[in-house]
Amino acid sequence: MIIANNDCFALQTAHTTYLFRKDAAGNLLHLYYGESIELDEGQLASVCDLLQPVIKNPNGCSLIADTALPAQCLDDVCLEISSRGKGDMREPFVELVLADGSRTGDFRYESFEIIDGLQSPDGLPGAYDAENQAQSLMITLTDRNSEVKLELIYGVLEECDCITRYARLINGGEETVRVERLMSMQLDMSKGALKINDFHGDWAREMNRNETILRSGKYINDTGVGFSSNRANPLFLWADTETTQDYGDCYATNLIYSGNHREYAEAGGHGKMRILSGINPDFFEWELAGGEVFCAPQAVMTYSHRGYQGVSRQLHHFVREHIVRGEWKHKERPILINSWEAMYFDVQEKKLLRLAKVAAETGIELFVLDDGWFGKRNNDASSLGDWYDNKEKLPEGLAGLSQKLHKLGMKFGIWVEPEMVSEDSDLYREHPDWAVRIPGKEHAFGRNQMILDLTRQEVREYILESMSDVFTRGQVDYVKWDMNRNMSDYYSQALPTSRQGEFAHRYILGLYQVLYTLTEKFPHILFEGCASGGNRFDLGMLCYMPQIWASDNTDAISRASIQNSYSYGYPQSVIAAHVSGCPNHQTLRITPLPTRFAVASVGILGYECNLCDVSREDMEEIRAEILLYKEWRSVLQFGEWYRLYESSEKQSVYDTDVTRWNIVSPDKSKAVGIMIKGQTLANYAYRTFRTKGLDAGSNYHFYNRSMRYDIHRMGDLINTMAPVHVKQDSLLHGAISKFIRLDGEKEDKIVSGAILDQCGIPLAQNYAGTGYEQNTALYQDYDARMYFMEKV
């Protein structure tokens, strides 16, 4: 709900209130964002009067922007938007260079409008409201130094406690203005210190959560690689310094954008904090001619007094209901097998069909043909852009392979990388000017490839035509849309010299145009985004593709950390995760198959290994995993995902190397608990599993996934039980292991949701080096457990 009264504005969600007002000089002052304040239109002005600081005397060395407020310095107040040149020395929201070369911005309030529905920026993806219950507020400001207007557009999504924001510049004059910065959101707060959370990394090391206390100076989270990047995800959280997972004031913002971005947290000199998020100004400028409009990307922000978990719940709801769209929004996603780690580039139809038949027998539903099927593609040095079938590998082409896979009862998926071109390709030889490179200068290659210039209409048309042909002739059910290099040599041969600073943003606009057209043309295809893993895992891509490959690192222990960090702002229904072979191809780590499954099950499950080479025992395990996942798929994909005691704040110092999750069905009738161990500790026998999110007034049947263990796990300790001596790893040891398995522990209790959530229940005793009994839990390094809860 939006309330406006004279010069005061309130954005009300179910549990939060956002207040700001116009001052006597026309500046917009931010007053409050936090827990809900009950107020109506008649109370709004008096509440704003109470919250507005009374300034009688200016601070030393302050600059006074307007004689109407002779004591007010803009550097010492909380503002809705900021610019340079009038006394606010902090990072600005907007920066313009006018025709005379001046840079001072002085935007003052002009008018407001309340609009039914949610607004989105032109040419960019944005949040939507399928129920059409949202409202938007548009505030118009005018620059006193030019004829430029600035529109601030707020959207209120009451049920998920989220507010969307973006800005629009309109040049109402005749002279061209250069835009050097236009952010998407600003939040000024009277806070002396904040705990900043950002998520950084690199290829195969995405989403490392970094927590920093900021008391002075600036904290910057940004990327200049051309895309949202694995180096700095646009998800950005800040909280009071005492905030925990479940308690305390916590805020978050995320950007609905896939290009270069920057998030600032700045501690000013007067006990105030400023948060900014938007396009990275270091890689951006825009010529705004008379009559033209420029829109910044949309951002979302949220607040919860229930700590990081509260913010996560709200962002998960926002992504599921207001970002992901189309046929697959609420539809259960199929279990897939991907050919990449099984074959890499060495794809042949016979090998593919052999793998597909084995996969179909296990219950896998979708076969994905990864890289290597097109042009003359035998390695990563050629053929990107040449999207015709390699008939040496696929004698009957995609159409023939697809038909055979469909006859097996499987869906057919294909890997493509449409934004790229190889120097050794027919496309590049015909259109060298379509590549992003500076003519006559040495080019920086990545993975032996270049980026196609999506700022050009003819390039976008080529991608649309070639991909439409691939999807149609292949009768494709699923597309993995990859992008495997960062931008370099920013330059378009189609742009004039004065507009080269627009290239990076224009590229993203071109990409969105392509994605919109294809997803509208092929609404039944399940699209999965990928960018060497998580190099473009963002809300912008999720507006077109309902799931994204989270990381090229398929190691279960690495993935547990990566997926745990994604959970701060993204639900598991958008995270693609695979069970791969061991030793893992990225880390060479060996982890048990049940652990690999447990981690990958919290997301969109796939397998990425050569099932034709899997042992009989492992094949039985995989069949059991797939049956289990299908039974619990709706919970695992669309349930509420809770982190259980993520940090050491509620764990023993001996128990911090454990990841715990709980996924609860929307109606709280079912839940899945997961515990993933790191390295095993000696003499640590007892653990408790405590849940979150259950119905306190109901009883649940709590039980675990039963396990049986190979006796090799006990080594020569088998001789403490065997009637004859058995040499470790001998033929006799191997023969015994074929017939005898050790039963794992069994958990089987009826317990209330209140006890599970508030107390937790003790689990079976771990093996601790002092003896083995019938119900002892045998934990080795990197083991995992899955627990199930059903209302009774």
Regions found by a protein language model. Name each.
Residues W328-E465, Y478:
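Aromatic-lined carbohydrate-binding/catalytic grooves of carbohydrate-active enzymes
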